[in-house]
């Protein structure tokens, strides 16, 4: 029984990995059908549906992976690092680095892969970015408590500016078919962001 469960879990993971790889390839710039995905995995469409009730559920699973990966790591950064600017820098690097290491998932983060899918999937991505922006806002607000002084610019505006930078770099990565990596020239770009943190 345990072997059957393990085999099923492995097949589910194989399906999700194939979907992510297809999103990374030129197929990712078009709608991915279950027929194409089944062919990529080497199974029938019926076999796909034994593991996932719908393609939407496959995207849900990938979004859950993205959420778990990013939120868990952001929480670790907040636990381990106390300096406000260092926290922000690490969170930005996390977002950009995650996108760079997972090009197919970046198509999901930018909404590109979800254009032909159910609207609620885009809603989940929107909620994820709202959570990240809320975390950034909290980091910025904690500076006042931790260091006794805040910023001259509203923390809400600063948080949205930082997140807009990240989203822009991820969109550029997808638009360029993964030619322009989000972390390219980060050490030169970060001072431009940090200069706004006054």
Swiss-Prot record:
Result of changing residue 73 to D: Loss of activity. Binds DNA, but does not associate with FtsZ polymers
Molecular function terms, GO-annotated: DNA binding; DNA-binding transcription factor activity; identical protein binding; protein homodimerization activity; sequence-specific DNA binding; transcription cis-regulatory region binding
Pfam families, per the entry: SlmA-like_C, TetR_N
Coiled coil: 117-144
Residues annotated to bind DNA: 33-52
GO terms under biological process: division septum site selection; negative regulation of division septum assembly; negative regulation of protein polymerization; regulation of DNA-templated transcription
HAMAP family, per database record: NO_factor_SlmA
Subunit-structure text: Homodimer. Interacts with FtsZ.
Name this polypeptide is given: Nucleoid occlusion factor SlmA
Taxonomic lineage of the native organism: Bacteria, Pseudomonadati, Pseudomonadota, Gammaproteobacteria, Enterobacterales
Gene from which this protein is expressed: slmA
């Amino acid at each position: 029984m345990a072997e059957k469960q393990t085999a099923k879990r492995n097949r589910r993971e194989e399906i999700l990995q194939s979907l992510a790889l297809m999103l990374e390839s030129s197929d990712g710039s078009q709608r991915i059908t279950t027929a194409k995905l089944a062919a990529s995995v080497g199974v029938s469409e019926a076999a796909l549906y034994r593991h996932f009730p719908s393609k939407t559920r496959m995207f849900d699973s990938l979004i859950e992976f993205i959420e778990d990966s990013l939120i868990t790591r952001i929480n670790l950064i907040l636990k381990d690092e106390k300096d406000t600017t260092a926290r922000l820098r690490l969170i930005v690097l996390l977002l950009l680095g995650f996108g760079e290491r997972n090009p197919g998932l970046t198509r999901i983060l930018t909404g590109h892969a979800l254009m032909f899918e159910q609207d609620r999937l885009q809603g989940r991505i929107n909620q994820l970015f709202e959570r990240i922006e809320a975390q950034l806002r909290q980091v910025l607000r904690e500076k006042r408590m931790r260091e006794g002084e805040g910023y001259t610019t509203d923390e809400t505006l600063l948080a949205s500016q930082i997140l807009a930078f990240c989203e822009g770099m991820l969109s550029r990565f997808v638009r360029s078919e993964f030619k322009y990596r989000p972390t390219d020239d980060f050490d030169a770009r970060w001072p431009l962001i940090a200069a706004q943190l006054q």
